[in-house]
Amino acid sequence: MREHKNFWDRNAGRYDRFMRKDREVYEKMYELIRPVVKDKTVRELATGTGLISRHIIKAAAHIEATDASVEMIAEAKRDNQSAKLHFSVQDMFRLPYADKSFDVVIVSNALHIVPQPEKALAEIHRVLKDDGVLIAPTFTHAGNSFSGKVRAFFMKLAGFPLHSKWTSEEYLRFLRQNGWAVRKSVVLKASFPLTYAECEKTEV
């Protein structure tokens, strides 16, 4: 995990520039998320520089957005202009919150890059209310086009920490096998296929 954090610390300053190429796809994702978080207490894991939280905060009641990278959170705080949005450094595997604390948990583009993502899902299950919603968009690299495979190859050379290489179907099956009912899914065409998933607990 230390190497994982070091990669994001090194790349925090250029992260937003890297993501600009997928701006239109992210706008579609924000549109999907806003009605789900409307007037809700939200927890975002792996927020990075806070792109998603900043774009949906007007809809939410409050967002606690966290990341394991100190430098990513420093970038996020620099651009934060909302009193409803709070950024902090946290470990998604050991969250300092009581059980059933949040209406919505967002974990975007993170489950494929952490070891043992099922443990992250178990911790999300713990802090999410029984009638809450998990929003888990994830790049599903096994469905890459040829150009996507080339990009992924060079990202790997640069140290990008890819741990799980799913197709969209494999990813949704992984969620179902780990205690979640997928109530909505959409594959968005970004630099890599982005599988947007909204989930509810199957066991409460």
Question: Language-model segments: what does each one mean?
Answer:
Residues 118-130:
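A short glycine-rich, Lys/Arg-flanked "PGG" loop and its adjoining helix->strand segment in the class I
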Residues 93-104:
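A short acidic, Gly/Pro-enriched loop at the edge of an enzyme's catalytic core
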Residues 2, 18, 22, 135-178, ...:
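C-terminal alpha-helical "lid/dimerization" subdomain adjacent to the S-adenosyl-L-methionine
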Residues 197-204:
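C-terminal lobe and adjacent flexible extensions of AdoMet/dcAdoMet transferase-like proteins
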Residues 40, 61, 103:
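Conserved acidic residues
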Residues 43, 47-94:
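Class I SAM-dependent methyltransferase SAM/SAH-binding core
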Residues 104-116:
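A short SAM/SAH-binding and catalytic strip from SAM-dependent methyltransferases
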Residues 1-37, 51, 55, 75, ...:
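Conserved class I S-adenosyl-L-methionine
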